Amino acid sequence: MKKYILIIFALFSFSATNAEIRWKLSEDGTLTISGTDMPDYTAKIENGKVCVSAPWYSQKNKIKKIVIEDGVTSIGDWAFPECKNLTSITIPNSVTSIGDMAFSDCSGLTSITIPNSVTSIGEGAFAGCI
């Protein structure tokens, strides 16, 4: 019985932690990112589809809002591509850089404020967002 409860919990809890970043996707579609320095992620083509190494990528169609909490200092390469239902992003003053292709093809994006603390925006960071 205990094993089944753990399996069910794992299936319904879309959150994870690594040494630098913690994330949680709530039922309302808000992806909250906390921690410090976000790593760069990679993208590759598998069976004709783009696959991204960001841990929340498999949930990309559920993401409607991204809240990056204070303390996160960078947004990594390929962090949030193809989040078609994403409409708003909150970036704190602690962020100084946005990586390559970070928000590419987020075609539903309507609201983002980039703070003055951001001194570097990578190539294609917002490609396909309009």
Spans of model-derived segments:
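Structural signature of tandem-repeat unit edges
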Residues: 28-38, 61-74, 84-97, 107-120, ...
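Sec-dependent N-terminal signal peptides
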Residues: 4-13
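Consensus positions within tandem repeat domains that build extended binding/scaffold surfaces
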Residues: 76-79, 99-102, 122-125
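Acidic/polar low-complexity surface segments
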Residues: 40-59
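The feature captures the LRR N-terminal capping module
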Residues: 20-30
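Sec/Tat signal peptide C-region and signal peptidase I cleavage site
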Residues: 15-19
